[in-house]
């Protein structure tokens, strides 16, 4: 997926829902956001997206500062929007910087574009 495609996906979502806050956007889209204590170790899971039986869920590590939770939520929202058919994504700090993972790179670009 090209950068232009990702920008267009963000623009389309914001226009459709009239929302630029990822927490409210998830609510508008019917995506359930859950909070779970997943630890503070450097390799702790930061968040993940899961779609099961048409129920979309993003789980965020509640041990993280709110500003980081917002970034993680935008990243996972990117997976929900861009990678619907893939099912489950676990977001580790290492994965965020893994440029060999195209889906992680796309979700990072989505989050960056969404939050600016």
Residue ranges and their predicted role:
Residues 1-116:
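Active-site hotspot residues in diverse enzymes, especially metal/ion-binding acidic/histidine motifs
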């Amino acid at each position: 997926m090209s950068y232009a495609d990702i920008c267009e996906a963000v623009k389309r979502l914001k226009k459709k829902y009239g929302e630029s806050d990822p927490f409210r956007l998830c609510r508008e889209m019917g995506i359930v956001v859950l909070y779970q204590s997943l630890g503070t170790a450097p390799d702790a899971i930061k968040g993940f997206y899961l779609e099961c039986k048409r129920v979309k869920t993003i789980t965020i590590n509640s041990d993280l500062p709110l500003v980081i939770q917002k970034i993680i939520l935008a990243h996972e929202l990117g997976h929900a929007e861009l990678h619907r058919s893939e099912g489950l994504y676990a977001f580790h700090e290492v994965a965020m910087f893994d440029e060999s993972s195209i889906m992680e790179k796309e979700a990072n670009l989505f989050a960056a574009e969404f939050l600016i």
